Amino acid sequence: ESFYDTVGGALLVLAHAAPNLSSIDSTVERPIYRGTLTASAALTSTGTPGQSGGIVVLAPYLLTFGNSGRVEISGANDPNTITTTAYVTGTKIVRGLPTRGSGSGPSGLLWSLDSVIRATFTSASAGFFAFDTISGDSSILSSQSVIEYDGIYYWLGVDRPLMFNGVVREIPNEQNLNDFYDNVNFAYRQKVYAYKVPRFGEIWWCYPRGNAT
């Protein structure tokens, strides 16, 4: 993620790497790192609490997320400070992406293991963001299976493909739904990832099939 730091007056790169490849629900937490985007020096820790899920920039704020639905929100343009902590769901949050807001500030979507949550900017005095559950009965196969295409979000659940365009809906698939879910190597589900081919209006999901790892 890129982020402008008004305290240091530089464009930063922010990074987080947790050992989730073998287990999407891993509770192991790792630090969040920062560095100047154009520098060659190694990244250094922001000094904020580690997380197991990941990070997302909802400019000018950094949100970090992980175990037990914990979300921590940085100060405006200051990734080295945490101003608010919220527990927004009961399970680990594994993915976050920015989305269109109401016009009063940034907004984002968070995917936990069993829900989809919207984060909406309120004000500094109210704790920055309000959180509401879009769906409390959802699922996600891989944190890298989520992709945005023209403002609509698509991802793979554990037994069906899903999308969000204001509400969560199942993506109809009468061609290869059973073939995919019967043959994906579930033990390596975190290797599933998505990419888009805008020229042809396509989204592709790549996955380990059969005994492939």
Predicted features and spans:
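Short loop/turn segments that connect beta-strands within beta-propeller blades
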Residues: 36-39, 76-78, 121-124, 166-167
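Short, surface-exposed terminal/edge motifs of secreted or surface/virion proteins that either
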Residues: 19-36, 158, 163-168
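Acidic/polar residues at beta-strand termini and the immediately following turn/coil
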Residues: 5, 22-25, 33-38, 194-198, ...
